[in-house]
Amino acid sequence: MDTFQVIILALIQGLTEFLPISSSAHLILPAQLLGWEDQGLSFDVAVNTGSLFAVVIYFRNELWAMFKAWIASMVKGQHSDDSKLAWWIILATLPAVFFGFIAKDFIETHLRSAGVIAVTTIVFGLLLWWADKMSRRDLTVYQTGWRKALLIGFAQALALIPGTSRSGATMTAALMLGLSRDAAARFSFLMSVPVSLGAAILVGKDLAESPLPIDYQALTLGTVISFVAAYLCIHYFLKIISRMGMTPFVIYRLILGAVLCGFIFL
């Protein structure tokens, strides 16, 4: 890949990973518009790692408090709001892990098409709008509970379907279950840590076994750009939804889905 391609793809990954607008829908557009080939496994690992670093550093205080409380709950039997939240995040991760293992090959073979991505971008955009407008939105992140956490986890598993958007699906489910916009976003972001870490380890294992050469300069640049873009995205997204809700992202998804349909059918 040349430098321009690295910059564009890393920006797309960083900006779309945590917005409810589907990163896979955006990554398919450069290929459609510019005829770019697949960026490769090593680049995927690099930009995903950059996004992971961004959410870990942004929520470092919350994650550290949760980790300490989680350890205390196991060692000393001391339970607090932070320890409960940590357990809920772990519980919410399990459905994606389970369905990821059993459905990965089917999804890669049958669902990674532009048509599927276009449809899911539109359908789940409408579901996000409905959830944002019709739900009560008054629960904090510490009022999630294990049942709601598990249901949000199943929504995350559903997001294995390309175009759905992991953050979009989890925020939609959280809003439907009564969480506030801020709580839904924060729970979704915190959920991304174990999932992204697990995915990076699995893909990194495949990369280590690959005989293909590695362009370390491109990977470093991609990681840094993805990190900066994702960090800024998280910061400003939390500000936007507190003022405007999810409507701007719903409108964007509908337009994006229509554009993808245009590429497919015209």
UniProtKB/Swiss-Prot annotation:
Describe the reaction catalysed, as an equation: di-trans,octa-cis-undecaprenyl diphosphate + H2O = di-trans,octa-cis-undecaprenyl phosphate + phosphate + H(+)
Q: What EC class is this?
A: hydrolase
One BP term from GO: regulation of cell shape
Question: Gene behind this chain?
Answer: uppP
Q: Mainly localized where?
A: membrane
Lineage, opening ranks = Bacteria, Pseudomonadati, Pseudomonadota, Gammaproteobacteria, Alteromonadales
Enzyme Commission identifier(s) = 3.6.1.27
Q: Tell me what this protein is called.
A: Undecaprenyl-diphosphatase
One cellular component term (GO) for this entry is: plasma membrane
> Annotated Gene Ontology MF terms?
undecaprenyl-diphosphatase activity
